[in-house]
Amino acid sequence: MSILWIVAYALLAFAASIALNLVYQFLYRTFNKSRPPLVFHWVPFIGSTIHYGMDPYNFFFSCREKYGDIFTFILLGRPTTVYLGTQGNEFILNGKLKDVNAEEVYSPLTTPVFGSDVVYDCPNSKLIEQKKFIKFGLSQAALEAHVPLIEKEVIDYLAQSPNFNGTAGTVDIASAMAEITIFTAGSTLQGEEVRSKLTTEFAVLYHDLDKGFTPINFMLPWAPLPHNKKRDAAHARMRAIYIDIINKRRKAGNAATGKPDMIENLMQCTYKNGQPLPDKEIAHIMITLLMAGQHSSSSIGSWIMLRLASQPAIVEELYQEQLANLERTANGSLPPLQFKDIENLPLHQNVIRETLRLHGSIHSLLRKVKNPLPVPGTPYIIPTSHVLLSAPGVTALSDEYFPNAMAWDPHRWETQAPEESKEDIVDYGYGAMSKGTSSPYLPFGAGRHRCIGEKFAYLNLTVIVATLVRHLRFHNLDGKKGVPGTDYTSLFSGPLKPTRVGWERRAAKSA
């Protein structure tokens, strides 16, 4: 058979598949009244994957105009039902464990990165216990102790990094924030011993491990692709580093080399069934902590600095807020930051809050349907063949809740503070917290999988931003306005390159 016949048959088969797909969609809309509307698509299996992947929010808003808040689209062959709005967030993120499951969706992606038997590679009840174990580093006392550590990391970085040589220059702010936040996460959530190991080798390992969070790994986490081979090698090496620390401490009587730290805490933890936390799981939890503590802070920190560079007047407002609201030393200068200072810096926190509203790093939260789910107030029943998708960022970007929603305006929060009903407070087993789903603003998720590091994230970012603003001014480079677009090619969205901004030292200008 000639190549022309092969091509002809292939084209014929492709055309037939499209025709059958169109017939299926017609029949689906005509007879499946108990299912949400299906987003129109030409190519089977691919479905709406490309439109969704290129710009998820554009996809969500355009589909909402056509189909309403509830619709289904095909994501690489998988029927994915989206339910937008606060009711959708409640339905999906507060779904019962017997009805919706996060582990089945995320485990193939996260387990090769974090390791086995932690996070999504274990029953939810075990994850709840693991969250309780790490609250050691998120307690009030711990947060208070974190402030000087974070400030020192930023000051040392400004003094030692070639990015900030001299009195003025330019910097790739996304790269700089990635470095700063891995150092602050290391100092605070990991401890002195691990922080001392955050050298070039560790940075390379972290980078290779991070590449495991690529969208293709939702489907092919086992594929022998170059980035997966590097991911697996990096995980093995990073785990070995933690195991080595643990072994040395056990021989020395379980003592940290400096102040008590997370590893020492985890070495003393025991599950409810009486089983001590295995060393392997300690190592995997430490890897998870490092990546969780750095990922969102790095992305949001980059967006904050890009926004500030685009509006230098806000940079000066932040600096003046510190001068006006914080105590001074005898010579009139600002003293080192303390935990008590944070509450006296409302504009700093509003800058973070507003940036989280516009630039959340996770646009989609997924759950596998385990039992047929009737949607209250609708004729729809979601079958077990579907995955549910919640997009809390949609309400955060809606004029309905935030007038002129696409504008970055930290001052909007002076009259629009986020509220959480006391009736929404629930304890999933690791401390009382808000379910949060009734709010249109959910930058840290909601329900039992809500991020427990919210207070740390605000603290970390507030201290980083306050310290940078004390020492530097920022501005866009000549000819540039606004901020870059969003890169959705990674699982954790961030700013598109280039992300270079200008800076100058305050002391240099005042001199």
Curated annotation (Swiss-Prot):
PROSITE patterns: CYTOCHROME_P450 (PS00086). Keywords: Heme, Iron, Lipid biosynthesis, Lipid metabolism, Membrane, Metal-binding, Monooxygenase, Oxidoreductase, Steroid biosynthesis, Steroid metabolism, Sterol biosynthesis, Sterol metabolism, Transmembrane, Transmembrane helix. It catalyses: a 14alpha-methyl steroid + 3 reduced [NADPH--hemoprotein reductase] + 3 O2 = a Delta(14) steroid + formate + 3 oxidized [NADPH--hemoprotein reductase] + 4 H2O + 4 H(+); a 14alpha-methyl steroid + reduced [NADPH--hemoprotein reductase] + O2 = a 14alpha-hydroxymethyl steroid + oxidized [NADPH--hemoprotein reductase] + H2O + H(+); a 14alpha-hydroxymethyl steroid + reduced [NADPH--hemoprotein reductase] + O2 = a 14alpha-formyl steroid + oxidized [NADPH--hemoprotein reductase] + 2 H2O + H(+); a 14alpha-formyl steroid + reduced [NADPH--hemoprotein reductase] + O2 = a Delta(14) steroid + formate + oxidized [NADPH--hemoprotein reductase] + H2O + 2 H(+). Its cofactor is heme. Its main location: membrane. It comes from the Eukaryota. The keyword Transmembrane applies. One of its GO terms (cellular component) is membrane. Heme binds at residue 451. The chain crosses the membrane at residues 3-23. It is a single-pass membrane protein. One of its GO terms (molecular function) is monooxygenase activity. One of its GO terms (biological process) is sterol biosynthetic process. Pfam families: p450 (PF00067). The keyword Lipid metabolism applies. It is found in: Membrane. Its EC number is 1.14.14.154. Sterol 14-alpha demethylase; part of the gene cluster that mediates the biosynthesis of the tetrahydropyranyl antifungal agent restricticin that acts as an inhibitor of CYP51 and blocks the ergosterol biosynthesis. Sterol 14-alpha-demethylase plays a critical role in the biosynthesis of ergosterol, the major sterol component in fungal membranes that participates in a variety of functions. ResB acts as a self-resistant CYP51 that contains mutations found in CYP51s isolated from azole resistance strains and that is not inhibited by the final product of the cluster, restricticin. Belongs to the cytochrome P450 family. This is Sterol 14-alpha demethylase resB. It comes from Aspergillus sclerotiorum. The lineage of its organism: Eukaryota, Fungi, Dikarya, Ascomycota, Pezizomycotina.
